From Swiss-Prot:
Subunit structure, interactors included: Homodimer.
Pfam families reported for this sequence: tRNA_m1G_MT
Catalytic activity: guanosine(37) in tRNA + S-adenosyl-L-methionine = N(1)-methylguanosine(37) in tRNA + S-adenosyl-L-homocysteine + H(+)
Annotated organism of origin: Finegoldia magna (strain ATCC 29328 / DSM 20472 / WAL 2508)
GO terms for biological process, alphabetical: tRNA N1-guanine methylation
Protein name according to UniProt: tRNA (guanine-N(1)-)-methyltransferase
Gene that encodes it: trmD
Record EC number: 2.1.1.228
Gene Ontology terms, MF aspect: tRNA (guanine(37)-N1)-methyltransferase activity
Compartments where found: Cytoplasm
Keyword ATP-binding attributed: no
Amino acid sequence: MKFIILTLFPESFDYLKSYGVIGKAIQNNLIELEVVNIRDYTKNKHKKVDDEIYGGGAGMLMTCQPIYDCLEDVNKNQSKVVFMSPQGKVLNQQKCIELSKEKEIVILCGHYEGVDSRIINHYCDEEISIGDYVMTGGELGAMVLIDCVSRMINDVLGNDESYKTDSHYNLLLQEDSYTRPRVFNGYEVPEVLLSGNHEKIEQWREKSRLNNTKLKREDIYQKYLKEKNQGGS
């Protein structure tokens, strides 16, 4: 999987290249990260990449020309182009699974007051948001997207079964988890987890997943019940 990030602040991604699991995946060539500076493509002699908004309005807007030329240069494979935007569909686990099947993804990061709508409407395939709030740029959102999608790629986590027990993978939240010591400040690990009975342990975990989802995310729990009933199970 290759991620091509178009940004005005390429140095923002230096940390990601050496960060934990994702950094190791890059070093082991499981994923590839290409960070491209949009400013390198501007034809403005002052290296300007933004301008005033037609019709008036606060702030400046990123112009079409440098973004378009950048896309034309780097997206030789006609890969999916994702624009990080608060107007996009909110990122979830199912979208991460879907994107992990792509061979290459181009991620456009906006800044200032955003990007000229002609770029979004005609040269981007999809807008994705990481939540219903506004940030100063798309870089942090792009890092979240890269991290979430990369975890779905074979060998990135070391154990390909790991992500399948994550919260949201099968709609339900993850079960409660415990490690040593067996008793901490009077709080004990559930006895069944120490029993060695794998069938009972799995039953406990399933119940814990259901309870956590119902308690913490009623909206997801109702969605789970709806899909379960539709499936006839």
